[in-house]
Amino acid sequence: MIDRKCKVTLGGLPQKIHVKGDETKPVLLFLHGGPGVCNRHTVMTVHADLQKDFLVVAWDQRGSGGSYRGAAVETLTIDRLVDDAHELVLWLCREYGRKKVYLLGGSWGSELGTWLAYRYPEHIAAFVGFGQVVNGAKNEELSYQFALEEAQKAGDEKSIAVLKRVGPPVMGVYKGGFDGMMAQRRVMMKYGGYSQSKKKRSYFRSMVVPMLCSGEYSIPDLIGVAKGYRYVLTAM
């Protein structure tokens, strides 16, 4: 069994990965969402069953978590992240004696995985996307409408005022940029829009607490988590 955390230089930037599982199994690279929302803690806990069939690799993409330090804003582009992912695939093939790896991507990770599989199919055994991005702008329209309708049903005037202040997204972008998006997300999560769970949790309880309690991240990693989310999303 392997349980290895290390940094791999991709596109000139040292980036954090966690490799865990049976070295004899096929390699599965997990592509997180956001961009900028690393999820090593969920990959290694919530998705731990994947280790029965795969050597699982969780990666903090450029600008996030353990890959925050030194990530210049001009390098935060889709093309650069696709190239980073390809370089990581090649490194994994060399390191573990494989010809191809499997990809699993959620939300933004599904978009990244689609580009990666399209450009470099010779190194990809298969790609599975969940929460697959097809039309990001439409996603945001539906998300905003859901949050507004739920707040109206609940008579939640405070949340309604917040949503009307940021306004409906235009081409997927909220008024106020990152801050406007986060204001919408807090209302959406308040009314259960984050997952199908019947439990309605705040952004802090849904996203922050699991990271802090997981033990997956070092202090520098957590600083990268806190700073990287805004940094990457604003840049991209």
Language-model features: where?
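A short loop-to-beta-strand scaffold at the N-terminal edge of the catalytic core in hydrolase folds
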Residues: 10-20
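Short beta-strand element of the alpha/beta-hydrolase
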Residues: 25-34
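The serine-hydrolase catalytic nucleophile loop
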Residues: 38-47
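Conserved alpha/beta-hydrolase
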Residues: 50-69
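Conserved acidic catalytic loop of the alpha/beta-hydrolase fold
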Residues: 80-100, 115
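Conserved hydrolase catalytic core segment
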Residues: 98-141
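A catalytic-pocket lid/entrance helix-loop region that shapes and gates access to the active site
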Residues: 124-170
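Alpha/beta-hydrolase
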Residues: 157-236
